[in-house]
Amino acid sequence: PMLNISGEFKRDYKDVKKGTACILQRVIKLKKPIGQEESTLQAVVVVGGVQVGIPMEELDVLKLIPADKTSFWQIAQLSNDLISYYEKKGYQGGMRQEQAREADDYMKELEHAKLFYDDAAIEDYLQCMLLSIIPEKMAVLREGTPLVRVLKSPAPDMLMLGNDCLLVSTGMLTALDSEEELYAVMSREVAHYVLDHAIITVNKNIARAKRAQFWGAVADGVVAATEEYLYDRYDYYVPGLVFATNDVVQALVNDNIANRMGLDYSEKQEKEADHIVMNFMVLMKKNKDAMVSALSKINQYYQRNKDVEALSKYGAYGSLPERVGKLGKFTPLDEDRNYLKKTST
């Protein structure tokens, strides 16, 4: 796609002097001459009305300057070398379809267990916020616009699934105190989405049970959790009734499922998302302390509830304390009554 991102040269490059303004127009693929090792991917840059080709591995010669949310996320993709990654791995359309089917299966289980919190006003509020963050056009082809669903779960969680559904837990809405904190956490999920962290992670999670077998086991776990709960409480319980309990939530919101869908991001990916969002908050004229404030409140929830699994080395929030510390000093955001009213569940 056409990009048209403004920038300047950070150092002398061929006949172009350091500090020269330019426009990154697009990225193209060249035919590779026989015996030539130079990259076939080149950035087309316009300097003083003249086009200059820059191999993608030399793109760091440019300082790209975002003007809005779309150019910000496009720069994030280019700086992360995603285009070269796709050149080596391919776009993996088959795997993406498989991940979308995995996510569809997951949502069916959530629906069956009655774990969706249906509130049109809250969903509309969250959807509008997501649309204000996500780019209108990416530097690499991605289709569809993510849709928000609210999950009945006391734990603060937010997950972007492979079928472009953003799950936001009721626990996340109550753990945070302001719109800017929610904006920051949602921007982190958009960062994972834009940088394709889930597909990259799935490629690393090679050992995978067959889809039907995996989700069958998940469904069995939900039924077992439900029936154990009801047998303990009612003498005349008839097996087969689905009833939402904390055990059911744990059966459907856990690290095994996150791993299955490539959402067990590496510590490097988590820190990368943190860093990107801090810069994004500045560009969008938001309080960048909101990011650290939100992560700190999420961490407090898991520490308070002594959630050993979530805080373990391989858990979803295992690196949170260290990440919060590395993000530096911050001022926790106060309660925003308007936000609390909009997200009251």
Q: What are the residue ranges of the model-derived segments?
A:
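Conserved beta-strand/loop element in small beta-rich adapter and peptidoglycan-binding domains
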Residues: Y13-K32
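C-terminal capping/extension segments of zinc metalloprotease domains
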Residues: P1, E37-S39, V44-V46, Q51-F116, ...
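Catalytic Zn2+-binding segment of zinc metalloproteases
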Residues: M172-L173, D177-E181, E189-R208, K286
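Active-site His/Glu-centered metal-binding helix of metallohydrolases
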Residues: M186-A198, E272, I276, F280
